[in-house]
Amino acid sequence: MNTFGSKLRLTTFGESHGKAIGGVLDGFPAGVAIDEEFLQSEMDKRKPGGKYATSRKEADEVEILSGIFEGFSTGTPIGFIIKNSNQHSKDYDSIKDLFRPGHADFTYFSKFGVRDHRGGGRSSARETAVRVAAGAFGAMMLKEFDIDIKSGVFSIGKLKSNKIDFEFASKSEIFMLDSDIEEDAKNLILDVKNSNDSVGAATLTIINGVPAGLGEVLYDKLDARLAAAMMGINGVKGVEIGLGSQASFILGSQNNDFMDKNGFMSNNAGGILGGISNGEPIMIKTYFKPTPSIFKDQPTINLNGDEVTCALRGRHDPCIGIRGSVVANAMARLVISDMLLLNASSKLSNLKKIYS
């Protein structure tokens, strides 16, 4: 599906080497002040270019087509496009008839019987620029509720952060949360890039200001929706909320978040219990695999099933988790915005405040 969300729905379209990518954000409430400078600043965080990312240079300027009037949202669908301008489609001519290892080439072809080989087409992470734009609109809405979402890179390869500093991450070229390992992480990225390889990463997203009681029960739990949002990002192979997998190795007496008159005494649950927020910061770790596009000869097969060698050209990120941290932030914004709108009808008192 190309649509995400329940009450707040984002539909995206476009391919990596098409004329443009874009989205329609439906269900966004009227009256939200739209800050286009903030929107572009968010796009610039994800924008390609630089020695730690792909050298493909795109302006990533968002052209708003509808849903905004005199600086405020109108309540109608917000339509927008982001034009592609720096495609090098010929770089992919040599692999148009074979399946790149680690990519969605084989699975897309198995499902649809056709695929756009130019930069991965629809499966390219280029599409995530649309999510970042939509997430920026979400942030403008969340600002009205004093909900703040921060993301950064927690680990690259085997280098893990021992401290969490979002202020530093906001200034870091690679959004690294720990200043003590940033230089080593940069060197690691350049080392794998220079050896025609890639490296994985993990990001940390923390959501502050979410009141207790946000989320749905059972099949639309808040943590389930957040996990689905993160797993829908290109290259993500795992998501943890709170302690995550560590909780399976400890005792209940160690995992439970006890309470006193001041509230919770710990936050192992990561801000969510029973699929509903408990008022504590929501903590999400998202794990990205190494970029599958590497410049090493790799065995694969072609459309006829013949064994061939894949020798890639083109421009690719040596570590997709870096820009992935920006996308993770955007997806969290969309989920929380959606859940706020859904929660408005969760009890009669909420409706009375609106209609009385």
From Swiss-Prot:
UniProtKB keywords: Amino-acid biosynthesis, Aromatic amino acid biosynthesis, FAD, Flavoprotein, FMN, Lyase, NADP
Residue sites binding FMN per the record: R122, S123, S124, N234, G235, G274, K289, P290, T291, P292, S293, R315
Textual note on the cofactor: Reduced FMN (FMNH(2)).
Lineage per the UniProt record: Bacteria, Pseudomonadati, Campylobacterota, Epsilonproteobacteria, Campylobacterales
Highest taxon listed in the record's lineage: Bacteria
Catalytic activity: 5-O-(1-carboxyvinyl)-3-phosphoshikimate = chorismate + phosphate
Quaternary organization: Homotetramer.
Entries under PROSITE patterns matching the protein: CHORISMATE_SYNTHASE_1, CHORISMATE_SYNTHASE_2
GO cellular component labels: cytosol
Residues involved in NADP(+) binding: R46
Family: Belongs to the chorismate synthase family.
Designated name of the protein: Chorismate synthase
Gene Ontology MF term list: chorismate synthase activity; FMN binding
Gene Ontology BP annotations: amino acid biosynthetic process; aromatic amino acid family biosynthetic process; chorismate biosynthetic process
InterPro entries: Chorismate_synth, Chorismate_synth_AroC_sf, Chorismate_synthase_CS
